[in-house]
Amino acid sequence: MKFHRLTAAVLAGSMLALPAAAETRVTYKSAKSASSYYQMGVQIAEAMQEASDGEISVTVEESQGSVQNVMEVRARGGDYVFTTPPVLVSLAQGGKAMFEGKGDPAFDDIRALFPIPSLTMHFVMSEESGATTLADLEGKTILLGKGSFGATEGEKYLDLFGLADKVEIADVELSNAVPAMQNGQIDGFVTAGSWPAPNVVEAAASTGVTVLSMSDEQIAETGRTKLVIPAGTYAGQDEDIVTTSLPVAAYTTTKMDDETAYQLTKTYWESKAKLGESSAWWNGVDEGLMENITGQIHPGAVRYYEEAGIALTDAQK
């Protein structure tokens, strides 16, 4: 398992209330180390370091994906921050889908902090495969990865589009997607990293790929939101890529104290503009994404949103 340790500073609360600042350690559970979401975690930690004076230490921790992140709530304490689509929190709390038979009271204690860039589905095919549409996946060997939301979503799409029995699924980790494509072990891979996704950037630059677009009808079948990745985002992509997206947020649980939740949320929003200067995926994050958080927000984060004048729904408070 990989860890990226960064000291992230978060401004202390009132000096009258806290006469001596004590270090608070926070674990930020993200995704696979080659993914955009792992890089986001590192960037968030760096931003907090720059904005503060070392009172919170953030350890960015690699993960197999969003499902694992939610499941670990059962064994984690008040220092646990993790990322996942809001829909997975709802499924966990309802004991549905991949959480059926795995319900736990700890899931009811999950609380949101702030939204981060949305998941973006990428169907990435090697140029040698000749695939230019989803229908062309028939007879191809595809890597979906294991345990991640992208893998689950990819399986869903293959089933929806009548391809489940027409493709071969490679038993390869997503972190090995690019070398597997280079040596001809796979024809393509599916990843749900926010654009520009690092593994897609690498594949496009090193082997030549086609990132497949979806039709409006296919997007409607998925029930997800339409998203357009601009032409030129990836090497060799001369046209816009039309695909789907799903909101993602950073979460903790009621075990986290209000002050820590407040400072994490405050520093995140105050650092977001600078984050966007170095990575394009942050530019799509604004207050409008708050409406995608369908569950409760941590009281400490609620305090920040109320101070900042950001409207919350009754269900979020």
What residue ranges belong to the model's regions?
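Bilobed "Venus flytrap"/periplasmic-binding protein-like clamshell domains
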Residues: R25-A51, I56, P115-N183, E287, ...
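Pocket-lining segment of extracytoplasmic ligand-binding domains
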Residues: P85-P86, G94-A97, K102-G103, D165-K255
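A bilobed periplasmic-binding-protein/Venus flytrap-type ligand-binding module shared by bacterial periplasmic
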Residues: I116-A131, K226-I229, L246-T260
